[in-house]
Amino acid sequence: MNPETLKFIEASIKTIPDYPKPGILFRDITSLIENADAFKATIDLLANHYRDQGITKIVGTEARGFIFGAPVAYAMGLGFVPVRKPGKLPRAVIEESYALEYGTDTLQLHTDAIVPGDKVLVVDDLLATGGTVDATVKLIRRAGGEVVDAAFIISLPSLGGDARLTAAGVKVVSLVELPGE
């Protein structure tokens, strides 16, 4: 990946201190997607990086994974598969629950969206603890798909998501790594 393009992408991400609460450094990707050149560079970089890797589907997690996953799928001429919270998908689904700081949450995938043999790229905006993408990977594998990589615009390695996904056998690719709280 082109280092100058990566620096341009990183520079387009604003950091908001003490949001949503004191002590948090919020990484705001809306500043990236508001900038047409930065948004295009991000999509092109991911699509070009994965174009010749035999990927058959792009999966994005609700909701910001849709922002990046769908245009990457379009640029690669592939289908896009949304993984959503319960009650948002109209056909038969499989689901996976995962732990949150206080409680649990659940994600769902249409049962016919991934078929055995699909080679899948998971795309999301930010990797923190890895819980959402870990649950997404489990759904894809249960459906018979192979997760090639999980790609993120931003990774906060200090929060453990990189290690969690690597331990689950998932290669993590991040365009920008930042310290995280």
From Swiss-Prot:
Catalysed reactions, as listed in the record: AMP + diphosphate = 5-phospho-alpha-D-ribose 1-diphosphate + adenine
Cell location: Cytoplasm
A Pfam entry, by short name: Pribosyltran
PROSITE patterns: PUR_PYR_PR_TRANSFER
Example of a GO biological process term: purine ribonucleoside salvage
One CC-aspect GO term: cytosol
InterPro entries reported for this sequence: Ade_phspho_trans (IPR005764), Adenine_PRTase (IPR050120), PRibTrfase_dom (IPR000836), PRTase-like (IPR029057)
GO molecular function, one term: adenine phosphoribosyltransferase activity
EC number per UniProt: 2.4.2.7
Pathway field: Purine metabolism; AMP biosynthesis via salvage pathway; AMP from adenine: step 1/1
Entry superkingdom: Bacteria
UniProt keyword list: Cytoplasm, Glycosyltransferase, Purine salvage, Transferase
Chief place of localization: cytoplasm
Quaternary structure note: Homodimer.
Function: Catalyzes a salvage reaction resulting in the formation of AMP, that is energically less costly than de novo synthesis.
Family: Belongs to the purine/pyrimidine phosphoribosyltransferase family.
UniProt name for this protein: Adenine phosphoribosyltransferase
Protein source organism: Aeromonas hydrophila subsp. hydrophila (strain ATCC 7966 / DSM 30187 / BCRC 13018 / CCUG 14551 / JCM 1027 / KCTC 2358 / NCIMB 9240 / NCTC 8049)
Gene name as annotated: apt
